[in-house]
């Protein structure tokens, strides 16, 4: 039986304040959450959308140590960047706060203390890695090593970013401290644990029986965790940055970030509504929906519900529509590798194009499987869909009305069967979009909204009012009235998806925003209503703009390759006498040309001090022939001649291969006589 609620509380995963927000965050969490919140508000429902920065945890302390500043300096900087970016991008939080706030510290401490006083924790001592040089325990990302699953040598103690596997520090092969680089030792330490196994029977019924409607990826991951059997999970860590564990004997220990962060949803609500926050968290007529990425499923479906159940007075989430991951140009997005499209940079590089990114991220939303963002697809969806379909229809409807009816909505006359079918087709859009949004299928909902523009384009193309204008203006009036009703419907249907563009469209239509209940109506614009000035809703994105973005990524990839470069192992030793057999000389390049039908080969004429010799070298992809004429190069002079592409090569030019595969010809520092020996 379908449940009915008085209000909806939307929570969004708290981004770590150790860097800006990127497109993976947007596609997985914030764009779908904002679409849902805007949709419910359009329906006139009571909604709260809660967000905030996660400002505790090891990634933040590591960045602070790397930059030589305090963790507070780090979170102050990035909280400001993140909050400003969200505002400019149109993410409509009712509050966007932070976990370093006084309200949150008190709320998290009180929550822990309530569970502690009720005897809901297990206190036990265990062995954990300890850095003797830095004199501290190594939690999570304070320890690095080789991933046992994929062999990545830079896996963290909580996760391997290369393969995405969740890890424990003891899983790592050849672990090292991320602080000192030293090999850690095992040392005993005391912590508090939440016994998840105690709540396993409840979770099995609540999820596996009562919430079979959850997305398959969410339901399936929860089932896997439950089938493996839940174990007690530590709620504290040996760190000096975070919320201190509020009990005696817990000096030097803070609340583990996974325990601390979700309480941020509660504390942020309390910060916004100090007198009525409990209505949103404890009234069973409130529906709570968590928007998260797949890496947070276990925390929001297993751990946080166990915490709430242990406390005893809170609602549990009604749905957790987690998304999979968005990749970038075929590679996993990574903050540490700077492999991302950062929102704050996008807003500078692409001014006024918030809706283009919202549209593309929704069209490529990783709702059921990992998906990929490419700049070429971004350009294609803008030019071929937003410009050519939606923008084209809106522009034609408004421009033709201005041309034939002085910008006033004309009176519709007698309808044809085709008119009636068109009206029926767009009247059905409301039910379709609504059904998809209610079930968190945002990608398909946006596609259905775009179908409305396709209906409009087809209608105008089939009716050809520009031809009828010469003979039948009453018929043109009917056609344009219907086209304008479709346009006004588009302003409603797309508002959750493209809010900036729909604000612009409402100005062009000269109307106030209409409610969701009016979607599908055929009388949104009255006859005689004066329209505003027609403008282009979207603009074409040129190749040069996309090429600049692709180049940024290529530069990042090159920087990563350089940072991760490892020289090849030294080959086995040879005898000194064997080396002395090589006759390495310096020669001057007299001529250099490309070898026909050979992409990699250059043919050299070289003065070796005794005669002129020919050498063929495979460096054509690294140098233009004219760049080498007149230069001096080192070459092996006594290599046996051999034929390459029919040319006898009398030696080998020496070059060094860089980390990126580029070759650099070896030359003497100062000019020497041709034929000089290299010793």
Swiss-Prot record:
Limits of the tRNA-binding domain: 578-679
Motif interval(s): 'KMSKS' region: 332-336
GO biological process: methionyl-tRNA aminoacylation
UniProt-listed Gene3D superfamilies: HUPs (3.40.50.620), Isoleucyl-tRNA Synthetase, Domain 1 (1.10.730.10), Methionyl-tRNA synthetase, Zn-domain (2.20.28.20), Nucleic acid-binding proteins (2.40.50.140)
Cofactor comment text: Binds 1 zinc ion per subunit.
Residue stretches spanning the membrane: none
Keyword terms: Aminoacyl-tRNA synthetase, ATP-binding, Cytoplasm, Ligase, Metal-binding, Nucleotide-binding, Protein biosynthesis, RNA-binding, tRNA-binding, Zinc
CC cofactor: Zn(2+)
Protein family per UniProt: Belongs to the class-I aminoacyl-tRNA synthetase family. MetG type 1 subfamily.
Name the UniProt record assigns to this protein: Methionine--tRNA ligase
